[in-house]
Swiss-Prot record:
This is Glycine cleavage system H protein. GO terms for cellular component: cytosol; glycine cleavage complex. GO terms for biological process: glycine decarboxylation via glycine cleavage system. The keyword Chloroplast does not apply. Residues 23-103 form the Lipoyl-binding domain. Belongs to the GcvH family. SUPFAM superfamilies: Single hybrid motif. InterPro entries: 2-oxoA_DH_lipoyl-BS, Biotin_lipoyl, GCV_H, GCV_H/Fam206, GCV_H_sub, Single_hybrid_motif. PROSITE patterns: BIOTINYL_LIPOYL (PS50968), LIPOYL (PS00189). Keywords: Lipoyl. The glycine cleavage system catalyzes the degradation of glycine. The H protein shuttles the methylamine group of glycine from the P protein to the T protein. The keyword rRNA-binding does not apply. It comes from Chlorobium chlorochromatii (strain CaD3).
Amino acid sequence: MTIPEDLRYTKDHEWMKLLDDGTALVGITDFAQSELGDIVFVELKADGTTLKTHESFGTVEAVKTVADLFAPVAGEIVASNPELASAEVVNQDPYNAWLIKMKVANPAEVEALLDAAAYRQLIGE
């Protein structure tokens, strides 16, 4: 199971990468995509949507289930990944197939998320 060291993680199995411009990429972890199975569709809220921490920003639909996606921190969606038209990219490379890019309201919130070691412990690795 791949768990990159340079990302932050949530207990809901989302990852977040803070960028230099104050925005962040958000996606689902390798663990999440493997638990979901074959992802067939991703539905996300529109660009410009303001999110509270832990608020749903969309869903991922797999062959046997639908799972909510939760904002790791508060902020505003500024973009969604155009590659998600082919939802299987999330299974193939979950850490490059980001779901949304968001403007983070409080960068300190990102630091409060789990680091790679804590996430490994959470999933029993």
